[in-house]
């Protein structure tokens, strides 16, 4: 017996690699193609249609990938995630983001509910004027503490927010200064979002924001600060009033934390009822993910397509194009979610991985991106599977022609990538057979946005299970931060190139 035959995971990968590779044209010559690969979910806030018919998935691949999911213990890993077991094995923690949406271990769900109640009270107090005239919030965080809130705010709070929110992540002072210029210090609160309350970028920006309040005559600057953290004691030590601290559990990872107290700026801008709809939309997707098996489980099916292209066809990138201006930040959000989770080279057991892991996630907003990167997608030598995401209902009140043209372009790009077009002039020839999937939201609102984000969280988890890795740690970000601290403190010598850069910038020593 060969080693691959003895190992069901390796054997299944080998069987997948041996499957025929029909073209998309050949697949579409078969009856029922769209019915096999497209499905519409009924969700709070409207439907979402998921269509993988323009990918190279076929019944044989779906069946083989289902066997892979069984061999890798997908059902068991999913059960452990929901039960609050320590699925983050390297750090010995659970991953409790589902509990924030009411799914999971009873104790975790109850605690999340109590934290939400505390946040709800503070949001209502601010809206009711109990904390004075609050018109602006500067939300300071980085990574998941900023990307999730920024995405939700850009999608849901564009028109007449209850409080004007500015998200600041970068340590570059230009970012914070721009927020200062847009806000009146007398009517501004500061939210400091840091899981550990030690993140250097966040705490440096927070100190500068506090100084800005003081310099502009705010008599009680600490009274204007809200801390969103899993380390409330550190927030108290920093000077935040205990009544202004909104805690969350350490087992809620940063890139999965929008649903926790990190969502405070979103709730403040759109109101608690709409924030609750965001949670319920995510919970509806959770229920689908938890209760559905095999390829009918849509996040798992998305992972099957991801693995088909990354592992079996050597695609090193995956592109995401949102044909909706309100989702322009989604590609950046997914970059962190997918690459920080699954950009690993060892398994959850600490062994070298046997194949490629997360591809590079990139993208943009349509139709802008068509005039920038689609040349490469259609005629370049790099094959990048594409996800197109659009909403059926427009988000504007302008002439319907705007939205009709937008959707026409979205659907046309997928059709063109698949079909291609022959020409006598090679420079005008399109090879076609290039894959894409389409996610079509009936209406973009808080509930469907919550479902869309949760879908990608579960897709990321499913990919991790199929690859045998832990998606809940991120040790790869630590070394650069460590060296940056050494540079800032001085007294450490580095390689010749780095020393020359330090000298040129005048920060060596």
Give short role names for the model-derived ranges:
Residues 446-495:
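C-terminal structured subdomain/cap of oxidoreductase catalytic cores
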Residues 36-37, 147-150, 176-177, 200-202, ...:
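Short helix/loop capping segments that flank catalytic or ligand/cofactor-binding pockets
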Residues 5-130, 135, 403-414, 418-419, ...:
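Extended, charge-enriched "interface" segments that sit outside catalytic cores
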Residues 121-292, 486:
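Glycine-rich phosphate-binding loops that contact phosphosugars or nucleotide phosphates
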Residues 52-53, 356-443:
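Helicase-primase coupling helices
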Residues 212-398, 479-485, 489-509:
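Active-site phosphate/pyrophosphate-binding segments
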Residues 136-141, 190-196, 317-324, 360, ...:
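Short glycine-rich or small-residue beta-strand-to-loop segments that form or flank ligand, phosphate
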Residues 152-157, 181-185, 206-209, 243, ...:
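Short, solvent-exposed amphipathic alpha-helical segments in soluble enzyme
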């Amino acid at each position: 017996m060969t080693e691959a035959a003895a190992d069901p995971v390796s054997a299944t990968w080998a069987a997948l690699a041996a499957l025929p590779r029909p073209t998309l044209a050949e697949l579409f010559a078969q009856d029922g193609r769209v019915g096999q690969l497209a499905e519409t979910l009924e969700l709070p806030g409207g439907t979402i249609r998921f269509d993988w018919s323009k990918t190279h998935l076929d019944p044989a691949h779906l069946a083989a990938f289902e066997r892979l999911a069984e061999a890798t213990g997908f059902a068991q890993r999913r059960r452990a995630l929901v039960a609050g077991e320590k699925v983050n094995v390297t750090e010995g923690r659970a991953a409790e983001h589902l509990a924030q949406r009411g799914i999971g271990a009873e104790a975790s769900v109850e605690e999340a509910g109590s934290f939400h109640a505390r946040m709800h009270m503070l949001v209502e107090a601010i809206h009711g004027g109990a904390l004075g005239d609050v018109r602006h919030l500067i939300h300071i965080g980085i990574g998941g503490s900023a990307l999730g809130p920024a995405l939700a705010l850009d999608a849901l709070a564009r028109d007449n927010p209850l409080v004007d929110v500015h998200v600041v992540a970068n340590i570059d002072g230009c970012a914070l200064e721009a927020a200062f210029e847009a806000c009146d210090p007398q009517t501004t609160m500061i939210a400091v979002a840091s899981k550990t309350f030690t993140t250097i970028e966040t705490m440096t920006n927070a100190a500068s924001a506090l100084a800005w309040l003081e310099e502009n005559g705010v008599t009680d600057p600490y009274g204007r600060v809200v801390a969103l953290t899993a380390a409330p004691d550190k927030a108290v030590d920093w000077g935040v009033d205990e009544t202004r601290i909104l805690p969350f559990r350490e087992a809620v990872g940063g890139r999965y934390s929008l649903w926790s107290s990190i969502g405070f700026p979103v709730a403040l801008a759109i109101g608690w009822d709409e924030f609750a709809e965001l949670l319920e939309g995510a919970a509806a997707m959770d229920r689908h993910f938890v209760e559905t098996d095999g390829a009918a489980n849509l996040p798992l099916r998305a992972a099957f397509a991801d693995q088909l292209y990354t592992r079996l066809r050597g695609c090193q990138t995956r592109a995401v194009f949102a044909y909706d201006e309100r989702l322009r930040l989604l590609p950046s959000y997914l970059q962190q979610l997918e690459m920080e989770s699954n950009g690993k080279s060892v398994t959850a057991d600490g062994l070298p991985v046997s194949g490629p892991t997360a591809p590079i996630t990139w993208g943009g907003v349509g139709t802008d991106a068509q005039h920038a990167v689609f040349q490469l997608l259609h005629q370049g030598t790099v094959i990048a599977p594409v996800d197109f995401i659009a909403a059926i209902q427009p988000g504007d009140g302008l002439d319907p022609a705007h939205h009709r043209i937008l959707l026409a372009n979205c659907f046309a790009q997928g059709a063109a990538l698949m079909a291609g077009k022959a020409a006598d002039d090679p420079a005008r020839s399109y090879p076609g057979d290039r894959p894409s999937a389409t996610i079509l939201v009936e209406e973009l609102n808080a509930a469907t946005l919550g479902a869309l984000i949760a879908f990608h969280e579960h897709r990321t988890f499913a990919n991790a299970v199929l690859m045998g890795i832990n998606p809940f740690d991120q040790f790869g970000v630590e070394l650069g931060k460590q060296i940056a601290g050494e540079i800032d403190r001085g007294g450490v010598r580095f390689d010749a190139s780095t020393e020359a850069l330090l000298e040129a910038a005048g920060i060596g020593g």
